[in-house]
From Swiss-Prot:
<dbReference type="Pfam" id="PF04055">
    <property type="entry name" value="Radical_SAM"/>
</dbReference>
<comment type="similarity">
    <text>Belongs to the radical SAM superfamily. RlmN family.</text>
</comment>
<feature type="binding site">
    <location>
        <position position="132"/>
    </location>
    <ligand>
        <name>[4Fe-4S] cluster</name>
    </ligand>
</feature>
<dbReference type="GO" id="GO:0070040">
    <property type="term" value="F:rRNA (adenine(2503)-C2-)-methyltransferase activity"/>
</dbReference>
<keyword id="KW-0819">tRNA processing</keyword>
<comment type="function">
    <text>Specifically methylates position 2 of adenine 2503 in 23S rRNA and position 2 of adenine 37 in tRNAs.</text>
</comment>
<keyword id="KW-0949">S-adenosyl-L-methionine</keyword>
<dbReference type="InterPro" id="IPR004383">
    <property type="entry name" value="rRNA_lsu_MTrfase_RlmN/Cfr"/>
</dbReference>
<keyword id="KW-0479">Metal-binding</keyword>
<feature type="disulfide bond" description="(transient)">
    <location>
        <begin position="121"/>
        <end position="362"/>
    </location>
</feature>
<dbReference type="InterPro" id="IPR007197">
    <property type="entry name" value="rSAM"/>
</dbReference>
<dbReference type="InterPro" id="IPR040072">
    <property type="entry name" value="Methyltransferase_A"/>
</dbReference>
<dbReference type="GO" id="GO:0046872">
    <property type="term" value="F:metal ion binding"/>
</dbReference>
<dbReference type="GO" id="GO:0030488">
    <property type="term" value="P:tRNA methylation"/>
</dbReference>
<dbReference type="GO" id="GO:0000049">
    <property type="term" value="F:tRNA binding"/>
</dbReference>
<dbReference type="InterPro" id="IPR027492">
    <property type="entry name" value="RNA_MTrfase_RlmN"/>
</dbReference>
<keyword id="KW-0489">Methyltransferase</keyword>
Length: 369
């Protein structure tokens, strides 16, 4: 088993990146523009360039006077993320991007194209403090929180790449965003919620994706799940449960020592009731660890009792990580697990695994240069 790491809820005190337009709400944008000595209407103009035209370089904003572009760039459009490299697999349909922030911090995002949609998996932190032993990100520890703009800019860059046909499959449109990359989103709560609002608000306030096409994942920070429910968003909540019993979950998902399975499912039910959305339960199936028939039965019973019809189980065949002695359950075991969960009246499917050979799959992101 991997070395046990401490839980880290508060990010190390490292300098955050300079303010960016995407950090600001509409009122703050207008104030920032006026501080530059520009008329107020420029605020919406700049926001439309960024959110609607997906343009992050003021030098290319032709409706902005050339004389002020450099000033605007320095004040509102600092370069936050630089692509270090792209890796592709699955016939080019999966592309992982390694980003370097302006302080040298590394993070990753993964773009996945399907026949009917394009999904971007984004990071909310550099590293992760939740210390799950089967996850490469968790084993690397937490470096720092990402800013709202660093989160949003991952999405803008992917949307622009799809629009411009820079990825395999020709021009397309970004349809889904999942906060399932590096980090525990609810441990960077304020910035993640602000990013969700930027991603889903229509221009000039955001990128205009449907809230229902955005998924926010968590290992189970129960109070933060309840807080998210009270934001009155309709994003999908995904809970990384991985086992239905506290004894094993205390090890697999160390945050369980703080909030038990029952507390997490109770918070998830509150979210489902408030949002009207079905909660997704993520379950990485690990050979001889959490794949026993009795655990499938227990999972189905607990979920049916806690969430009724407002739940769906995503089984994830464990993706290999360096140094781990664990591997995925055999297909017959996986099939029987699904059958048993379904027999309890709970929806359950096996997730299509993408990006394994480029370490872009669930639990593999380690931001290695």
């Amino acid at each position: 088993m991997a070395v046990s790491l401490p839980l880290v809820f508060t990010a190390p005190r490292r300098g955050m990146p300079p303010k960016h337009l995407a950090d600001l709400d509409s009122t703050e944008r207008r104030e920032a523009v006026k501080e530059l000595g520009l008329p107020g209407f420029r605020a919406d103009q700049l926001a439309r360039q960024y959110y609607a035209r997906l343009e992050a370089d003021p030098e290319k904003m032709t409706d902005l006077p050339a004389a002020v572009r450099e000033q605007v760039g320095a004040a509102l459009f600092p370069t936050l993320l630089t692509a270090v490299k792209h890796l592709a697999c699955d016939g080019g349909d999966t592309r992982k991007t390694l980003w370097k922030a302006n302080d040298g911090t590394l993070l990753e995002s993964v773009l996945m194209r399907y026949p009917d949609r394009a999904t971007l998996c984004i990071s909310s932190q550099a590293g992760c403090g939740m210390a799950c032993p089967f996850c490469a990100t968790g084993q690397g520890g937490l470096q720092r929180n990402l800013s709202t703009a660093e989160i949003v800019d991952q999405v803008r860059a992917a949307a622009a790449a799809l629009r411009d046909g820079d990825v395999h499959g020709g021009p397309g449109r970004l349809s889904n965003v999942v906060f399932m990359g590096m980090g525990e989103p609810l441990a960077n709560y304020k910035r993640v919620v602000a990013a969700v609002r930027r991603i889903t608000s229509p221009a000039p306030d955001g990128l205009g994706l449907s809230q229902r096409s955005v998924t926010v994942s968590t290992v189970g920070l129960a109070p933060a799940i309840r807080k998210l429910a009270d934001e009155d968003l309709s994003v999908t909540l995904a809970v990384s449960l991985h086992t239905p019993d506290d004894e094993l979950r205390d090890t697999l998902v160390p945050v369980n020592n703080r909030w038990s399975v029952a507390e997490v499912l109770d918070a998830a039910r509150y979210y489902a009731d408030k949002s009207g959305r079905r909660v997704s339960i993520e379950y990485a199936l690990i050979r001889d660890v959490n794949d026993q028939p009795w655990r499938a039965d227990m999972l189905g019973k607990k979920l049916r009792k806690a969430l009724g019809p407002l739940v769906h189980v995503n089984l994830i065949p464990l993706n290999p990580t360096p140094g781990s002695e664990w591997d995925a359950s055999p297909k017959p075991v996986e099939k029987e697990f699904v059958r048993r969960v379904l027999a309890q009246g709970v929806s359950c499917t096996v997730r299509d695994t993408r990006g394994q050979e480029i370490a872009a799959a669930c639990g593999q992101l380690a931001a290695e240069n």
